[in-house]
Amino acid sequence: MIDYRAPLAEILFTLEHIADAPRIIHWDSGLAAEVLTHAGRFIDEAIAPLDPIGDREGVKLVDGRVHLPEAFHRAFAQFREGGWQGLAADPQYGGQGLPGLLASAFSEMLAGACISFHMGVSLAQGVIRTLAVNADDDVKALWIPRLASCEWLASMCLTEPQAGSDLSLIRTTASPQGDGWTIDGGKIFISGGDQDFTGRVVHLVLARTRDAAPGLKGLSLFLAPSHLEDGSTNGISVVRIEEKMGLHAAATCQLAFDGTQAVMIGGPGEGLKRMFTLMNVQRLEVALQGVALADCAAQRTLSYAASRVQGRRGDSTGPVVISEHEDVRRMLMTQMALTLGGRAMTYATLADIEADGGSPLVDLMTSVCKVFCTEAVVEAANLGIQVHGGYGYLREYRLEQILRDSRISQIYEGTNGIHALTVAGRLLKDGRTISAFDGHIVAAIAAAQQSGNPATTQALAEVLEDWRQASEVVATSPHPEPLAHSYMRLTGLAAFGAAWARLESHAEKAPDPVKIRALARFVRDFMLPEARHHARMCQLPLRLDDMPVAIFQVA
């Protein structure tokens, strides 16, 4: 069993040749390699050893304050001293002004090494981006330097007991007071709602002004600090921390706001519009969490399979390592393919955002990456447990920890089912979205053809045709909901196949060209055929709303 090792060479290859990072303004390939090499060393040495400690010790609530393991404090001091939080922040606010894609690559490595530590610090980067786009100059000048320097950390406060996926049910209120506002209400499931790294947290809160319209249109966005400028507390208390399946060292808090002083970000009723910047970034961050933990699972499983001697092959004279068995190879290659393909999809989407801004393709790919990569990590962890056999079921080998830590990724930042409904409903009805994604796959087919990969060209062309036919059916269906799951999976597989066509086209530039070509063949022959099943499901007249009501009721 090994600790995570930052996959630096594969990340740099993906950034340069698949995401085409050099198209981003101010991208410097040499500097990116230097920064990420230094980051990888820090993460391997300081962050990766925290993972089993955090899982074992967890967080504690003592006298109303969250306390993290002592080892986390030592690592946070190095994180802060290294200036990692401010990688992409504007230099005028104390940041380093590097591309956001570079910060995302750092974030992937951080999540792979210790997802609980990552959860505690990473939201600040999204809040920095949100304030940079939406806040007044005086708010930016006060808060971005504090966040970039790790003087303060941050949280995002949306969820309430009655308002999970349906934010229109939010009840937390905001009342005008002088030149600001006061917040009253409660929020649950707040990652990083409190911590003792700095003892200071700035919360972005969705709340409803008292004269606001009902529903989503009545929500506004507020910045509420845990402490006021004189150092006194600001009416925010930690009611409890949740005991979770995983992420034991990530503080998931229930917060109470009682006359909490706050400033509005944007105008009244613009809460979701202003929060959109943070929510989209966080959805791609969750996709990268999936990539990172899938990579961790693949690393541990490959190490085990290469050393565990068990069974014989027909042509062997004695016991062999289990990586020589074909079914084990299937599982290992699935892990590796999901990791590399998910990384390629997500980095390319992040690069599109930074280079070109928003687009119909980005809107679609944000949901596709979030869903595909979070499903991929659970599959990768399950396969890792299976390869380990009985040992995989033991805590000592830490594959079960990856499964526990990653399972939440299919739930937060929009459940995967809701993302599927969004794609099969609203986004699919936008002709620009269909055209943009179609063109994205066509370009990948052309790249495969130009690179002399006829089998990949044919396989991806078949997936594209299946996707086109399914899109027409789903877009015109009066009841797309039962088709949404299969349509999202089909769309994800098409994007995954396109990513692998590009990876194969650039195989000679990869750290291990033989590995890329072998995995590309595996994806084509063993993974893409799944698309045909989901295409057929989309053709069926499926209905679930006419099922007997009684079977969904408790006797």
Segments and roles (model prediction):
Residues 24-26, 53-68, 274-281, 285, ...:
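Glycine-rich cofactor-pocket loops
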Residues 2-5, 247, 363-440, 522-554:
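Alpha-helix capping/hinge segments and adjacent helical runs
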Residues 189-191, 227-239, 244, 251-282, ...:
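A glycine-rich, basic-preceded beta-loop-alpha segment at the flavin cofactor/substrate interface
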Residues 59, 123-124, 135-172, 176, ...:
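Internal maturation/activation junctions in enzymes
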Residues 136-139, 143, 422-466:
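A structural-propensity feature for long, helix-poor, extended segments
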Residues 447-555:
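C-terminal amphipathic alpha-helical interaction region
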Residues 180, 184-233:
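A short core secondary-structure module
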Residues 1-118, 142, 540-555:
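Amphipathic, small/basic residue-rich leader segments at the start of a protein or domain
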